[in-house]
Amino acid sequence: MNPLKIRKAFLFLLPFVVMAILVGCSSDDPAEPTEAPAVSEPAKEAEPVKEAKEDDHDHADHDEDDHADDDHADVPASAKEVKDVPRNRTLVFTGWSDYYKTQHDNVENFNSWLPGNQHSRHAMNKGLTEYLFYTNLNNGELVPWIGESFEYNDTMDSIDVVLRDGVEWSDGVPFTAHDVKFTVDMVIANSPDMNRSSAWADMIKSVEITDDLHFTINLNRPDPRFFINQFGLGHENHTAIVAKHVWENEDAMTFNNYDPEKGWPLGTGAYELVRSTAEAQIYDRRDDWWGVETGFTDLPEPERLLFIPVADDDVAGQLYIANDLDYGPPLLKGTFEAAKARNDSLRSFNSEGPEWGAADGCNFVLIMNNQKKHFDNVDVRWAINLAVNRDEISNLAYEGGMPPVELPISSYGVKQYLPLMQDIIDKYDAGTHDLAKSAARMETAGYSKDSAGYWTKDGEKVVITLEIPSWMRPQGPILEKQLQAAGFDAVFKQGEPATIGDRLQMGETEVVWVQCGSINEPYDTFKSYHSKNSAPPGETYKGAVQGGRYENPEMDAILDEMEGMIHSPNDARYVELARQAAELYLRDMPVIHIAEEKHVVVQNEHYWTGWPGVEDPYAAPYPPWNGHYLITHNLKAAK
């Protein structure tokens, strides 16, 4: 499959000639272009942000439209002149795999607090936006940036924060505590319509300013993890502080944060946006960046960041082969290995397969609405779980690149808790594929098979409509076949992420999705199963990944106590609560975890070295994460 799949990419390239020109393809020597990528001429009209529902966890609920509108707007003629930058000083990247497009959208809207606007995770996080703190999730090390330090009080409901002195916005105005307070107040005032606004309104009582560099965040209740999760995890917590002196004069819900003549969008990062079109976003390095002026750190070596759209992983694979792409979407394992065979400059986080990729703290999960008929029965949910062959999905869909999981715990620091739960995991043995036990569960629940071999009760079949977004499509046909073999009337249906997300939030479908959260501790994932994140039938659920609508007062009480605790595998009470949560999850099986996401994140060393990997894990490698800004600063020109 693999070499053929790469060859098939050529069939797709003709419609994307403009894109190929943008990244500097050359018929004479495609691997060594010397000119900066060409830039298309600007157009005239602005495009509004696409409507979307609030998404309190960016990774878990992608509100993307994979088909760009026909009418795209480019930068007005008043935009800054774009200088020439050679290819070997330009870092070329694309969006993540949920951003497969032939053209960028929202090209004149950089209000990253509005749902549906994804610039903050696909481009702005690479160089324009800086966050208070980052975390190297490989070892848990905190990396202070525009924030210098923070400290909780003894009751864990107040955080004193110190900002770094000398930080400036790209227009030269100092970055201060007033910007932070303004941002927090703005987001809460616009709850629930802004990203993260529900979580902030629920947890943040107030922000008090001491002076320009000191402020305090007061919480409504103790939560020792809230600050770092919101302002310093380096994951998908895209909580960009906005410039008060600009935003206080605007309506935050309609402000597009874009005016080339005024230098908008402002950022404190080492790069500024100089052009935005349907074909490319261009960010050029600011040699007057505050980090150099204050002696904090050196300028990053890339002089330009070029963000281009790409149609799918076939096209991305061909661009990687031609050295026209430095990083961007992950490739399927086979596609990556075929591409690497043709270009030895390509690498991933791990130096060898089959698990080339790094963990992203998320699992693939089959979500069933626990309020719907059939799925409201724990025996039915367990029967479906026993029908799933996780090893087969891992091996056939992902060639062993996505390891099976049975508990809502992924990688990084949280894995230290798994040995403390192993006896419970062994007791339930949820990862076993056993059709006989599956059938026994269904019979216990009062079901019998009809003449076609499907499970029925009261004359009604158990129908499972497996709606799966495009980036998870490889597992669809396999899972469909497994469930059918177990007597469930299952149908795989590939759909658009935004449409599936809407239906999932309303509880209208069964979905294979992703659940994220378990980066540091069990609580960060189990909290999704709190009843407060559910909703009555027919209403939209409140939690980012609570599509299962699981409600259990026992689980609620456990999670309420864990919320106010500092996690530690050495804290006997915390460990006991985590074990109780794991036991309830495995007993009730509210959703079915299938495999751990370990994407083959591609890094091209032809023009740039210094990428993170197992040999130097200074940052997690995922392009959509805030921490990718640290990678931009670590890259070195290869030639």
At which residue positions do the language-model features occur?
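Gly/Pro-rich hinge or "lid" segments in bacterial periplasmic/extracellular proteins
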Residues: 117-118, 123-126, 134-141, 235-299, ...
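Ligand-site clamp/hinge motif
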Residues: 164, 259, 289-341, 480, ...
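N-terminal lobe/hinge region of extracytoplasmic solute-binding protein
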Residues: 92-154, 185, 266
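Detector for C-terminal structural segments
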Residues: 29, 95, 275-281, 285, ...
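Surface-exposed binding/hinge segments that line
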Residues: 84-86, 162, 199-250, 606, ...
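Alpha-helical secondary-structure segments
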Residues: 90-95, 176-183, 212-218, 222, ...
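Aromatic- and charge-enriched surface segment that lines or borders ligand/interaction sites
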Residues: 148-193, 210, 216, 316-319, ...
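Extracellular/periplasmic solute-recognition and catalytic clefts
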Residues: 187, 194, 206-209, 274-284, ...
